[in-house]
A protein has these predicted regions:
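Solenoidal tandem-repeat scaffolds enriched in leucines and small polar residues
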Residues: 182-258, 262-263, 273
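Helix-capping and short linker residues that terminate individual alpha-solenoid repeat units
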Residues: 119-123, 165, 181-186, 238, ...
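Bacterial Sec-dependent N-terminal signal peptides
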Residues: 1-26
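Solvent-exposed beta-strand/loop surfaces of large extracellular or lumenal domains
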Residues: 487-512, 530-538
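C-terminal beta-rich recognition modules with glycine/proline-rich loops and embedded aromatic residues
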Residues: 246, 310, 372-381, 386-470, ...
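Helix-terminus loop motifs that line ligand-binding clefts
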Residues: 91, 105-141, 171, 321-330
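C-terminal beta-strand-rich structural cap/linker in extracellular carbohydrate-active enzymes
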Residues: 477-480, 492, 510-525
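Aromatic (Trp/Tyr) and acidic
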Residues: 24-105, 109, 138-164, 204-240, ...
Length: 662
């Protein structure tokens, strides 16, 4: 084992850590909205605050990170499996963000210690993964999944440097980058997904594994994803070699994939090709990670074709492949047409994480509130539906219709780690700024404490329709309030006076010299409605040679309905329907709901931390009329009833369903 670095002191103040590092000077395209330092978002309360605290205090603090850092430091890995070797990168980034945001010195001390253990194990040549030294050589410098695993190590080190200014993190990530620059590039190793080379690889269907680019069925994209953290390193250092390498990677995707997948993104943007047609298998999470790199290169170079490619892909996914909850991915990939099955391996947590990050990047680049709307829907519905409300562990898949608690307890694997990472990232999505402009994108009960401007945001939104923003530190600011597109009649007041110009799907700009005690209030009326599922079919499945699950369509006369309240998606969850006397009821077969009248609000008292309000609706279960309780989908992480013995963790004790038949 290499020595552990002794200097474990970072020059930060947990009370308020400034944005020490800025990448803006390296970019030709400035962000319309710049994220605020995570430490400036404080005292997050309500349902979201409770779940973020659960992630920090229960999951991250109790995670056996020592075991996984030992695995990296010992460096004896030779197998294909990637789940052990991706834990340290994701945990380091999550724990740093969570500790800095919350002012948690205990967690900060723990993550610093583990970070310096990892850095202390770094080889002289720069390698920082888990693969055994005697496995690697100049002709085989990494394992097949190293690029994917180290993607998160790159980003963890870069995030630590950006948020804290820790020079050791920067030095380490530069050494890691140097390892890839030495071994990959023109006339060196490349990210081929199989033994085939261009042009013999053109339009070939692949299966199996590759030497350096992950699963062959990803057609090189599981190696090329390093274009993003490498370009980020250019932004942090200004060293052109990192930009050149990132551009070299992207310029070869067509050749390596054998499907011209990068160039044909232009056809996706034109609307003449679905993203699923780019190659035989389009893995959602892997594509998102590459898209983040394309957007970063757009910022750096000003190449508008990159923005067009990614925004066009986002529009296609949003219009065809996004679920009502804001989640994406069908058995980890994108399907043809409007194929979106309701149960099974649906909405992978890894894809949730990278889709949220991708959407946030598009918001920052464009200032278009449609992206913030999509993030709101995803955050308040699917992000927390995937999280076990007791341990904080996250599911691999969280289908709209399914069963529990089976699915919450597995791993650690890619999705448990992606779950804690996206929850740790959430506070970075609430607010943004640029010059005198300040953007409030997500109405989560919290405090913002900046150097010249501060406020408290309260109101328990979205359980409540009302938001209150009280200024606590005054400055001249243009406050940009996102008015959601789903809200038809938003009302905004400053110190009790109604403002004109409040229009849904836009920012309302309020330009004034604020005084401490000034108060902004928003009233965002939420429509309650049943919605019929569009483009619904039956979806028989089949598999590719590598075992990947794919789907076909069959017509059906049975079309389900869901209940919405503003951005909140509801479900029938048998945890809250004990009176039906069948906790694992087959809801699709035996339950029919009355969609001709709206559900009524239900009074509910419980000691658990859940989002409300609850509703009651009429239904028929196996021939008898019943009252069903409808609850926000985000609550399905509670898989037990208060006061009752908990079921076996791997059981299917309770069923739930967003989509119900009438």
């Amino acid at each position: 084992m290499k020595r552990i670095l002794k200097n474990s002191t970072i020059a930060i103040t947990l009370a308020c850590i400034p944005a020490i590092v800025s990448a803006s000077g390296k970019d030709r395209i400035g962000l319309v909205e710049r994220p605020v330092p995570v430490a400036s978002v404080q005292n997050i309360k309500g349902f979201v605050g409770d779940r973020i605290a659960l992630n920090r205090n229960t999951y991250l603090k109790n995670f056996p990170i020592e075991k996984y850092v030992d695995f990296v430091v010992d460096r004896q890995h030779r197998d294909w499996n990637w789940t052990q070797a991706e834990q340290h990168g994701k945990w380091i980034e999550s724990a740093y963000l969570s500790a800095v945001q919350s002012g948690d010195k205990e967690l900060l001390d723990k993550v610093q210690h583990q970070l310096y253990r990892i850095i202390g194990s770094q080889e002289a040549e720069g390698y920082l993964g888990a693969t055994a030294r005697d496995y690697r050589s100049d002709s085989r410098p990494v394992r097949g999944m190293d690029a994917y695993e180290l993607y998160f190590v790159f980003h963890a080190l870069e995030t630590v440097y950006e948020e804290t200014g820790d020079k050791q993190a920067l030095q380490s990530v530069e050494k890691l980058a140097g390892y890839f620059l030495k071994h990959f590039g023109p006339d060196k190793n490349e990210f081929w997904p199989s033994s085939l080379r261009h042009p013999e690889n053109m339009r070939k269907h692949l299966a199996g594994t590759s030497d350096f680019a992950g699963h062959s069925v990803h057609y090189s994209w599981e190696g090329t994803l390093l274009c993003d953290p490498m370009a980020r390193l250019y932004e942090l250092t200004g060293k052109k070699k990192y930009l050149d390498w990132s551009q070299w990677v992207v310029s070869n995707i067509d050749r390596w994939s054998g499907w011209d997948a990068f160039s044909r993104l232009d056809s996706v943007a034109d609307g003449t090709l679905g993203i699923d047609k780019l190659q035989p298998y389009v893995h959602s999470h892997t594509f998102h990670m590459n898209f983040l790199g394309f957007l970063r290169l757009y910022r750096i170079t000003g190449d508008k074709s990159l923005l067009r490619k990614v925004s066009g892909a986002w529009n296609d996914i949003y219009s065809r492949q996004m679920y009502i909850t804001g989640g994406v991915s069908v058995a980890e990939h994108y399907e043809h047409g409007f194929v979106k099955p309701l149960s099974g391996n649906i909405v992978e947590t890894c894809a949730t994480m990278s889709w949220m990050q991708l959407t946030q990047q598009l918001l920052q680049l464009t200032g278009d509130t449609k992206y913030a709307d999509a993030m709101e829907r995803l955050m308040f519905n699917h992000v927390f539906a995937a999280q076990d409300a007791e341990s904080g562990s996250c599911r691999y898949h969280t289908a709209p219709n399914g069963s529990k608690p089976n699915g919450f307890f597995h791993g650690p694997d890619c999705c448990t780690a992606s779950g804690h990472r996206i929850i740790s990232l959430l506070p970075t999505f609430f607010y943004a700024q640029k010059g005198k402009d300040f953007f409030i994108n997500q109405y989560v009960t919290s405090e913002y404490v900046g150097s010249d401007f501060a406020f408290n945001l309260s109101g328990n939104y979205p359980e409540s329709e009302d938001v209150k923003i009280e200024i606590t530190k005054a400055a001249r600011k243009i406050v940009n309030l996102r008015l959601p597109s789903w809200c038809k009649t938003p009302v905004v007041k400053v110190n009790g006076e109604i403002l004109n110009g409040a229009s849904s799907g836009t920012y309302l700009k309020i330009d004034r010299k604020w005084k401490a005690g000034d108060c902004i209030t928003l009233h965002l009326p939420m429509e309650e409605k049943w919605v019929m599922r569009e483009n619904h079919s039956n979806y028989p499945s089949y598999t590719l040679p590598g075992g990947e699950i794919m789907y076909k369509e069959e017509p059906t006369d049975m079309v389900p309905y869901a209940f919405l309240r503003g951005p909140i998606v509801y479900c029938v969850d048998m945890v809250w329907n004990k009176h039906i006397s069948n906790d694992d009821a087959n809801l699709a077969r035996d339950m029919r709901i009355d969609v001709n009248k709206l559900p009524q609000r239900q009074t509910f008292n419980d000691t658990e931390s859940v989002m409300g309000p609850f509703y009651q609706t009429d239904a028929n279960y196996m021939g008898r009329n019943v009252k069903l309780t409808l609850t926000p989908f985000c609550n399905i992480g509670q898989w037990w009833r208060s006061g009752e013995q908990k079921s076996w963790r791997n059981s299917n004790a309770f069923t739930y369903a967003i989509w119900m038949y009438k």
